[in-house]
Regions:
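Conserved ABC transporter NBD signature motif
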Residues: 79-89, 95-96
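Catalytic Walker B motif of ABC-type/P-loop ATPase nucleotide-binding domains
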Residues: 178-182
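ABC transporter nucleotide-binding domain
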Residues: 196-284
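Conserved ABC ATPase "signature" region
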Residues: 23-28, 120, 124, 131-149
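C-terminal coupling/interaction segments
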Residues: 286-332
């Protein structure tokens, strides 16, 4: 069952164009030239219930715009969006009760109140019974390790504690779909890991659908089953993330140090040159060709030293952003 259906969605914004100079600034007070900016262009995809989907792209790719359209904060210029069978922009109560939203740079918690007082407000908004409210708060706070700080003012909490409480506020009503926009932004490594582990277990137990955007790639790499990549407002990749991981595992980096000056162009026949300087080159080759490649290079060049390394998460995301098609093959 598809719980999210996006079909041919586009979104354009109008911006005022202001020319440089005092005279042009004065003219703009009376006549403003407007330009259209395309944030989303003919975006289509479907999400099955219970899946964790990663939505990634460079800054300005359209991730936040698409996320806001899916939760009903903005209306698309054209196309249709169905989330749990609802048009998000209608903001029907049943729809709002079926989603949870965490925006990493926008707080739900009141600065001078305790998280628990915000939870009480959400209890009334989502019409939770006393029993359900207590059960959910106790369970979520225990799993996230924040039981002891629920009644402390938000201003006295660390960033990690606040973000965990933000997460509780968003899922207190047991939503079917959870939208996470940069949920671990600014957090330390341990806090990020704790939130990821919690989300894995929570979503598995409750079959919750999750759409997550993040520039911190371990969030995507460790949580997501499928990946959607946006580039300039368009979907350039929509596929199972496991296939990408398997593809990446089939590559190795070979770092080579040479006795004499080397022209990196001479190494291109052996693999993709990733880095180079006067006396060293790093190339990317398929794992099955590593031994053959090293043997051939040693015969042709005076190599002082070489070593092999795995592709890192950062390497992976750079390769993914450089994909030119919707296939699994990586082409950087």
């Amino acid at each position: 069952m598809n719980i999210i259906e996006i079909e041919n969605v586009s979104k354009t914004f109008e911006r005022v164009k202001i020319e440089e100079g005092l005279i042009n600034s004065f003219k703009s007070l009376f006549k403003r030239e407007k330009v259209k900016v395309t944030a989303l262009s003919d975006v289509s995809f479907k999400v099955k219930e219970g899946k964790i989907i990663g939505l990634i792209g460079a800054n300005g790719a359209g991730k936040s715009t698409l996320m806001k359209a899916m939760v009903g904060l903005i209306k698309p210029t054209s196309g249709t969006i169905l989330v749990n069978g609802f048009n998000p922009h209608d903001k029907k109560n049943d729809f709002l009760k079926s989603i949870g939203v965490v925006l990493g740079q926008k707080n739900q918690l009141w600065w001078d109140l305790s998280p628990y007082e915000t939870f009480l407000l959400h209890k009334e908004i989502y019409e939770l019974s006393d029993t359900e409210f207590k059960k959910n708060v106790d369970e979520l706070a225990k799993n996230l390790g924040v039981l002891e700080i629920l009644k402390s003012p938000v201003r006295n909490l660390s960033l990690g504690e606040r973000m965990k409480c933000e997460l509780i506020a968003s899922i207190l009503h047991s939503p079917k779909i959870l939208f996470l926009d940069e949920p671990t932004i600014g957090l330390d490594f341990l806090a990020q890991k704790n939130i990821r582990n919690f989300l894995k277990n929570y979503c598995k137990e409750r079959n919750t659908t999750v759409v997550i955007t993040s520039h911190y790639f371990p969030d995507i790499y460790e949580l997501c089953e499928e990946l959607i990549i946006l580039k300039n407002g368009e979907v350039v990749f929509n596929n199972n993330f496991k296939k990408i991981k398997e593809e990446i595992k089939s590559y190795k980096y070979i770092y080579l140090s040479f006795e004499n000056e080397i022209d990196s162009q001479d190494l291109k026949k052996y693999g993709e040159v990733k880095e180079s300087d006067t006396f060293s080159v790093t190339i990317k080759v398929q794992e099955k060709l590593v031994n053959e490649t090293i043997s051939s290079i040693l015969k042709e060049f005076n190599v002082i030293d070489y070593n092999l390394t795995e592709m890192s998460s950062q390497d992976l995301i750079e390769d993914i952003y450089s994909m030119e098609s919707t296939g699994v093959k990586i082409t950087v």
